[in-house]
From Swiss-Prot:
Binds the Arp2/3 complex through the C-terminal region and actin through verprolin homology (VPH) domain. The keyword Cytoplasm applies. The modification Phosphotyrosine is found at residues 151, 248, 337, 486. The gene is WASF3. This is Actin-binding protein WASF3.
C-alpha cells in the first residue's frame, strides 16, 4: 500500500448536504464549492511551502559541501604552487603526526524513522488514534519487557530480521572453524615416511682397498660406519675404546689435554720407582691391546720431567699443589717413562679390578688408610688422583726445589686441601636452602612472561570487542555477514592457547 505523503483537503468540492430552509439551493451549492476551492488552494500553498522548504534545505547542504571542497582545493593549490622540493623538505615527524585523509561515506540508514519523518507524514501520524497506554504496566512485569510492544512494535520486523542474520553469520563462522580443525587433524594423522640413511661411500671404498687378510675387524668397521649419528655421537663399540680416557675425568680444559703433564708421584724412603717388564706385564694384564696402544700413542713425551718435590713430615697431609695429571695414563706407564734406568723393580703390584676403577673421582672413591712407612712398595697400591689421599712417608733426602705450581684450574683448588665425601655432600644439601638470587636475566624472563600474559588479555579483549555488534542497522549487519562468508582466515575464532605459550 503506497504511503500518501501529502494530501490536499478537501478532496470533494461539491459533495455535501444542503441545510433545510434554504430558498436558493443553487446559490448555496455555488458558495460551498467556491469555499472548498479556496481551502484546497490554501492546502496546496502549504504543501508548496513544505516542498520548497525541503528543496532549500537540500540546496543549502549542497552549497556547504561545495564550499568546503573548494576551500580544500584552494589550500592544496597554494601548497602545490609554492612547494620547492630543493629547499624545503618534509620531515618524517610531520608525516607521522598527521593522519592520512579518509573519506567517510555515510550510508542512508533507517530512512523511515521517527527522526527522518517529514512534516506532512508527522501530521498524518498525529491525526491517527493513539495506542492504549499499556506502557504503565511495564514496571509490574517480571521479564522487564515493554508492555506496549505486545500491542504495537515498530522495530519488530527489523529485530526479527537482525536475529536471523546474526544466527546465520554465527553458523557460518562455526562451520569454517570446524573445517579448519578437520584440516588440522587430517594433517597430523598423515603417514610419516622413513628417512633413508646416508651412506658413507668414502668409508666403503677405503674398506675395499684393503686385502681380506689386512682388512680391519668387521664389527669395528660397522661400528665406525653405523656408530656415528647425525649429532656425532659414538656407538657403544667405538665408545668402549675411549672409555678409559673419557670416563672418570674432569671436563676438558687446557690443563687436561691429551698430552701428558708433569706428574710427581710420592715414594717412601728407600723405595725405587718400578720400571721394566714387570710394570709392562701388569699393564698388559689389565688393559686390552687396543686401549694400551691408544694410550701409548697419546702418552708421548713432550717435555723433560721435573724432579719430585720434597714430602711433608710423617703424619701430615699432602698440601703442596701438584700439576694436573692426565688420567688416561696408567701409573706403571708414568713411572716407567720418568725412570728409564734404575735399580731392579720390586714385586708386581696387587691385582686391581680394572683400569677404570683406579681412576674413580675423589668424591666417589672411599678414603684408604695410610700405609706404614716400612712398607716396601707404597706406590704399588691402587692409584687415585694426586689431589687426594693421605700418604704417610718418611722425610725424603734433600733435593732440588719443587717446580712452580701450574696455572689455576679445576683441580688446583682441590689439591690445596684434603677432600672428604660427607662435608661436600652436606654442602650440596645446604645449597638449595639458600634464597634465589635475583639478577637481570631472571627479571627479564619475568618481564617477558608478564608481557605474554598482558598480550593474551589484550587479544581476548579484542576478540570480545569484535564479537559485539558494531551497528544496529541493515548495512552493518549485511557487511559483517559478507565479510565472514568471503574471508579466508577465521579472524573471529576463539583465542588459541598454543600461541605465546610459556
Amino acid at each position: 500500500m503506497p504511503l500518501v505523503k501529502r494530501n490536499i483537503e478537501p478532496r470533494h468540492l461539491c459533495r455535501g448536504a444542503l441545510p433545510e430552509g434554504i430558498t436558493s439551493e443553487l446559490e448555496c451549492v455555488t458558495n460551498s464549492t467556491l469555499a472548498a476551492i479556496i481551502r484546497q488552494l490554501s492546502s496546496l500553498s502549504k504543501h508548496a511551502e513544505d516542498i520548497f522548504g525541503e528543496l532549500f534545505n537540500e540546496a543549502n547542504n549542497f552549497y556547504i559541501r561545495a564550499n568546503s571542497l573548494q576551500d580544500r582545493i584552494d589550500r592544496l593549490a597554494v601548497k602545490v604552487t609554492q612547494l620547492d622540493s630543493t629547499v624545503e623538505e618534509v620531515s618524517l615527524q610531520d608525516i607521522n603526526m598527521k593522519k592520512a585523509f579518509k573519506s567517510s561515506t555515510v550510508q542512508d540508514q533507517q530512512v523511515v524513522s521517527k527522526n527522518s519523518i517529514p512534516n506532512p507524514v508527522a501530521d498524518i501520524y498525529n491525526q491517527s488514534d493513539k495506542p492504549p497506554p499499556l506502557n504503565i504496566l511495564t514496571p509490574y512485569r517480571d521479564d522487564k519487557k515493554d508492555g506496549l510492544k505486545f500491542y504495537t512494535d515498530p522495530s519488530y520486523f527489523f529485530d526479527l530480521w537482525k536475529e536471523k542474520m546474526l544466527q546465520d553469520t554465527e553458523d557460518k563462522r562455526k562451520e569454517k572453524r570446524r573445517q579448519k580443525e578437520q584440516k588440522r587433524i587430517d594433517g597430523t594423522t598423515r603417514e610419516v615416511k622413513k628417512v633413508r640413511k646416508a651412506r658413507n661411500r668414502r668409508q666403503e671404498w677405503n674398506m675395499m682397498a684393503y686385502d681380506k687378510e689386512l682388512r680391519p675387524d668387521n664389527r669395528l668397521s660397522q661400528s665406525v660406519y653405523h656408530g656415528a649419528s647425525s649429532e656425532g655421537s659414538l656407538s657403544p663399540d667405538t665408545r668402549s675404546h675411549a672409555s678409559d680416557v673419557t670416563d672418570y675425568s674432569y671436563p676438558a680444559t687446557p690443563n687436561h689435554s691429551l698430552h701428558p703433564q708433569p706428574v710427581t708421584p710420592s715414594y717412601a724412603a728407600g723405595d725405587v720407582p718400578p720400571h721394566g717388564p714387570a710394570s709392562q706385564a701388569a699393564e698388559h694384564e689389565y688393559r686390552p691391546p687396543s686401549a694400551s696402544a691408544r694410550h701409548m700413542a697419546l702418552n708421548r713425551p713432550q717435555q723433560p720431567p721435573p724432579p719430585p718435590p720434597p714430602q711433608a713430615p710423617e703424619g701430615s697431609q699432602a698440601s703442596a699443589p701438584m700439576a694436573p695429571a692426565d688420567y688416561g695414563m696408567l701409573p706403571a706407564q708414568i713411572i716407567e717413562y720418568y725412570n728409564p734406568s734404575g735399580p731392579p723393580p720390586p714385586p708386581p703390584p696387587p691385582v686391581i679390578p680394572s683400569a677404570q676403577t683406579a681412576f674413580v673421582s675423589p668424591l666417589q672413591m672411599p678414603m684408604q688408610p695410610p700405609f706404614p712407612a716400612s712398607a716396601s712398595s707404597t706406590h704399588a697400591a691402587p692409584p687415585h688422583p694426586p689431589s687426594t689421599g693421605l700418604l704417610v712417608t718418611a722425610p725424603p733426602p734433600p733435593g732440588p726445589p719443587p717446580p712452580p705450581p701450574g696455572p689455576p684450574g679445576p683441580g688446583s683448588s682441590l689439591s690445596s686441601s684434603p677432600m672428604h665425601g660427607p662435608p661436600v655432600a652436606e654442602a650440596k644439601r645446604q645449597e638449595p636452602a639458600q634464597p634465589p638470587i635475583s639478577d637481570a636475566r631472571s627479571d627479564l624472563l619475568a618481564a617477558i612472561r608478564m608481557g605474554i600474559q598482558l598480550k593474551k588479555v589484550q587479544e581476548q579483549r579484542e576478540q570480545e570487542a569484535k564479537r559485539e555488534p558494531v551497528g544496529n542497522d541493515v548495512a552493518t549487519i549485511l557487511s559483517r555477514r559478507i565479510a565472514v562468508e568471503y574471508s579466508d582466515s577465521d579472524d573471529d575464532s576463539e583465542f588459541d592457547e598454543n600461541d605465546w605459550s610459556d
